[in-house]
Swiss-Prot record:
Annotated EC: 6.2.1.1
CDD domains: ACS (cd05966)
Function: Catalyzes the conversion of acetate into acetyl-CoA (AcCoA), an essential intermediate at the junction of anabolic and catabolic pathways. AcsA undergoes a two-step reaction. In the first half reaction, AcsA combines acetate with ATP to form acetyl-adenylate (AcAMP) intermediate. In the second half reaction, it can then transfer the acetyl group from AcAMP to the sulfhydryl group of CoA, forming the product AcCoA.
Catalytically driven reaction(s): acetate + ATP + CoA = acetyl-CoA + AMP + diphosphate
InterPro entries given in the database record: Ac_CoA_lig (IPR011904), ACAS_N (IPR032387), AMP-bd_C (IPR025110), AMP-bd_C_sf (IPR045851), AMP-binding_CS (IPR020845), AMP-dep_synth/lig_dom (IPR000873), ANL_N_sf (IPR042099)
Sequence positions that bind Mg(2+): 537, 539, 542
Lineage: Bacteria, Pseudomonadati, Pseudomonadota, Gammaproteobacteria, Alteromonadales
Gene name of the record: acsA
Protein name: Acetyl-coenzyme A synthetase
Similarity comment text for this entry: Belongs to the ATP-dependent AMP-binding enzyme family.
Post-translational modification: Acetylated. Deacetylation by the SIR2-homolog deacetylase activates the enzyme.
């Protein structure tokens, strides 16, 4: 298949890379054979207040599960992102901020960011926040979001960042679960030209009858818009900062003390609070950031993720700042007001490393490469992809149009639960294949198992599990350790179950086939939906595709494809048949879609993830009880898909 084409490491990257292929293999082998020794060495890449002597104490036994790393050491995450850089790099840019409107620009040096964080840490203390308290952060993409997180870490409070697109009900459930004492927000946010009513959403969330834990709401003035004000509860960020001291000694935290909570989106039932602790997480975030992106001193690094997602935590705040990087933060979306915005920002800020999501790449691809005719891109050296498997066609477009065929692409696979990247190419070490996450990071032992838990060897496919712990791993589900054990360690005993399916090819490269519940069983054959989607998107008239299974009288499950065409393409029955033949040719007769529904848009969360549970229900003609759609960017998309569905009962 065309997906097997190999892209060699560019010679100019190989010449200066942190590790080459031989070094990767040697380091990886050491990390698996001698994890104690390996992580003892690399655990010292960050600053410890009391150095650790104990490295690893972990068990994946579901009757006696525990995960501890560097567990007798003490440190502070904020000090590792700020104080350690002050002696030599106080004047170096830590943050470059560009607003939704490109005319809004701000910068903060490491010295300035340190001062802001210390002041806000003292402000939090003045409002009664103490070590171990949970603070909810519901902010736009402004530097103050990072300041709030680092200030919490400085005083030992646990931050719980909620994505600024979430509904009041979603906020309320997270505030209740975390028992938050203080909420930090802004009057309004600005995103793609639209005003986001952040404070109004908080007011509504806190009016929920079960929310009785919040004592204070700190409000940053972003737009100056009119907002409701609750005397005695609400307080302006600015007025707190006016009187706060710039001196704040970082709290000495145990390596296993909590750093943050982050609730996984899209899960059914109660929100699942993923708990990450301080020591192992900081080591892993910093190390993966440096090695996966081959980070060099003085480079400008842009991760387009929102701070409300794990990618924003690990690869916009903690990892890059621990490494002393200059981080670009963008308030808006990289294809507003025009698709050219991404390229304009890369050129304007001389971005060296770009980390973005397949959903954005596909959106830009649908607009056409002529949008990038004025794009120079000469500053770019490394490009990354995150969030979901990237279609080979989108990978190639990213490589050709954005990377000008000179930038290695690191297609990273990981999860909220893993804290950092688990499987990814390393720019100077790994020849890449479009659509493959390739090889495991140091210390990570992936395996494939069949449905009863037997490990399958060689070129094969199955359920993706991890056989041993790594420092960035989540420690528990907040307040519900039994749920942690049940979700991740009961399905396959003694292994961490990722919930993803994967294929390993003859070179040992891993291909993520999607969530296991995104596997279709057609006439007894397992088929990853990502594979069918990739084939559809490879057609020149297809901008995006989502594939699900639906009940089929003969096959058990049939293949139902939702297809969005490129601009200007016409939806015809001839094209529908052409696409069916196209997939048949690309993958085989088994993968031919039974039904292809034209879709002007797909139901996505505001982070761009397709909400497949809605698509599965519509395909199954179960349209009366679709469940909560509050996390969707555009709920109206659902109504249109229901109206135009193909699998109606007669």
């Amino acid at each position: 298949m065309s997906t097997q084409s190999l892209y060699k490491v560019p010679s100019e990257i190989a010449a200066n890379a942190l590790v080459n292929d031989e070094q990767y293999k040697k380091m990886y082998q050491e990390s698996i054979v001698n994890p104690e020794g390996f992580w003892r060495e690399h655990g010292n890449r960050i600053d410890w207040i009391k150095p650790f002597t104990k490295v690893k104490k972990t068990s994946f036994d579901d009757h006696n599960l525990f995960i501890k790393w560097f567990y007798d050491g003490t440190l502070n995450a904020s000090a590792n992102c700020l104080d350690r850089h002050l002696e030599n790099n106080a004047d170096k840019l830590a943050i470059i901020w560009e607003g939704d409107d490109a005319k809004d620009q701000r910068t903060l040096t490491y010295g300035q960011l340190h001062a802001e964080v210390c002041k806000f840490a003292n402000a939090l203390r003045s409002q009664g926040v103490r070590r171990g308290d949970v603070v909810t952060v519901y902010m736009p993409m402004v530097p103050e979001a990072a300041v709030a997180m680092l200030a919490c870490a400085r005083i030992g409070a646990i931050h719980s960042v909620v994505f600024g697109g979430f509904s009041p009900d979603s906020i309320a459930s997270r505030v209740i679960d975390g028992n938050s004492k203080v909420v930090i927000t802004a009057d309004e946010g600005v995103r793609a030209g639209r005003i986001i009513p952040l404070k109004a959403n908080i007011d509504e969330a806190l009016s929920h009858p079960d929310v009785n834990c919040v004592e204070k709401v700190i409000v940053m003035k972003r737009t100056g818009g009119d907002i409701n004000w609750v005397e005695g509860r609400d307080i302006w960020w600015g007025s707190l900062m006016e009187t706060a001291s710039e001196h704040c000694i970082p709290e000495e935290m145990g390596a296993e003390d909590p750093l943050f909570l982050l609730y996984t989106s899209g899960s059914t039932g109660n929100p699942k609070g993923v708990l990450h602790t301080t020591g192992g997480y900081m080591v892993y975030a910093a190390m993966t950031h440096e090695y996966v992106f081959d980070y060099k001193e003085n480079e400008v690094y842009w991760c387009t993720a929102d701070v409300g997602w794990i990618t924003g935590h690990s690869y916009m705040v903690y990892g890059p700042l621990a490494n002393g990087a200059t981080v670009l933060i963008h308030e808006g979306v990289p294809n507003y007001p025009t698709p050219a915005r991404l390229g304009e920002m890369v050129d304007r800020h001389k971005v060296n490393i770009l980390y973005t999501a397949p959903t954005l790449i596909r959106a830009l691809m649908a607009e056409g490469k002529e949008q990038f005719e004025g794009f120079d891109g000469s500053s770019l050296r490394i490009m990354g992809s995150v969030g979901e498997p990237i279609n080979p066609e989108a990978w190639r477009w990213y490589n050709d149009v954005i990377g000008h065929e000179k930038c290695p692409i690191v297609d990273t696979w990981w999860q909220t639960e893993t804290g950092g990247i688990l499987i990814s190419p390393l720019p100077g070490a790994t020849d890449t294949k479009p659509g493959s996450a390739t090889r495991p990071f140091f210390g990570v032992q992936p395996a494939l198992v069949d449905n009863i838990g037997n490990i399958v060897e060689g070129a094969n496919e199955g359920n993706l599990v991890i056989l041993d712990s790594w420092p960035g791993q989540m420690r528990t589900v907040f307040g519900d350790h039994d749920r942690f054990v049940l979700t991740y360690f009961k399905t396959f005993r003694g292994m961490y179950f990722t919930g993803d399916g994967a294929r390993r090819d003859e070179d040992g490269y891993y291909w993520i086939t999607g969530r296991v519940d995104d596997v279709i069983n057609v006439s007894g054959h397992r088929l990853g939906t990502a594979e069918v989607e990739s084939a559809l998107v490879a057609h020149e008239l297809v901008a995006e595709a989502a594939v699900v299974g639906y009940p089929h009288d003969i096959k058990g499950q049939g293949i139902y494809a939702y297809v969005t065409l490129t601009k200007g393409s016409v939806e015809t029955e001839e094209l529908r048949q052409e696409l069916r033949q196209w997939v048949r040719k690309e993958i085989g007769a088994l993968a031919t879609p039974d039904l292809i529904q034209w879709a002007g848009g797909l139901p996505k969360t505001r982070s761009g993830k397709i909400m497949r549970r809605f698509l599965r229900k519509i395909a199954a003609n179960e349209v009366t009880n679709l469940g909560d759609s509050s996390t969707l960017a555009d709920p109206a998309v659902i109504d249109t898909l229901i109206e135009t569905r193909l699998n109606r009962s007669e």
